[in-house]
């Protein structure tokens, strides 16, 4: 309980707001390929931060995105997960659950901090919808791991 309170205080001060431009970042994905955020200007992207790969809560959330991923693709929406895990851990998780989208390793915790999603020990479970112009369209600070993917898809397609 104490750690959760500290995590909240730790990142609230630096949170981005809807309408802000997304910070530019470079991270390695699960295959150790460099992901450059600037290369995705012109595309809508869902970026979600999560605590740890292969934990019960995060597995539900990731599989929720997997289960309706085709709908995201049909609507030209990319999905990307970011955590402090190593690229290797993310690759194992992606393969274990047959997850069709990319995961990025923020092992230095710099990207989470730039988004205001950093916590003391893990990133906060937060999601950012980034529009085609690189601006934050929507921020989800409260996440229901069972329905999160469906909620985002509904919000973006209705």
PLM features per residue range, with description:
Residues 1-28, 158:
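N-terminal targeting signals for export/organelle localization
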Residues 49-67, 71:
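Conserved redox-active cysteine motifs that mediate thiol-disulfide chemistry
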Residues 80, 91-125:
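Short, internal strand/loop/helix patches
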Residues 25-45:
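A short beta-strand-turn-helix
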Residues 124-158:
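Thiol-/selenol-based redox modules, centered on thioredoxin-like
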Residues 22-23, 44-46, 124-126:
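Short loop/turn microsegments at loop-to-beta-strand junctions
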Residues 43-45, 50-54, 86:
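Short pre-active-site segment immediately N-terminal to redox-active cysteine/selenocysteine motifs
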């Amino acid at each position: 309980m104490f750690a959760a309170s500290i995590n909240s205080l730790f990142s609230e001060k630096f949170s981005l707001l809807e309408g802000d431009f997304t910070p530019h970042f470079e991270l390695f994905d699960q295959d150790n390929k460099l992901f450059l955020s600037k290369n995705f200007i012109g595309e809508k992207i869902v970026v979600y931060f999560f605590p740890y790969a292969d934990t019960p809560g995060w597995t539900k959330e990731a599989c929720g995105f997997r289960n309706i991923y085709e709908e995201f693709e049909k609507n030209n929406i990319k999905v990307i997960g970011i955590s402090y895990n190593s690229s290797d851990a993310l690759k194992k998780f992606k393969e274990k659950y047959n997850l069709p989208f990319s995961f990025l390793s923020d092992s230095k915790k710099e990207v989470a901090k730039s988004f205001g999603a950093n916590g003391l020990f893990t990133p906060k479970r937060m999601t950012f919808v980034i529009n085609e112009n690189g601006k934050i369209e929507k921020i989800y600070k409260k996440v229901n791991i069972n329905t999160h993917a469906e909620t985002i898809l509904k919000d973006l397609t209705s």
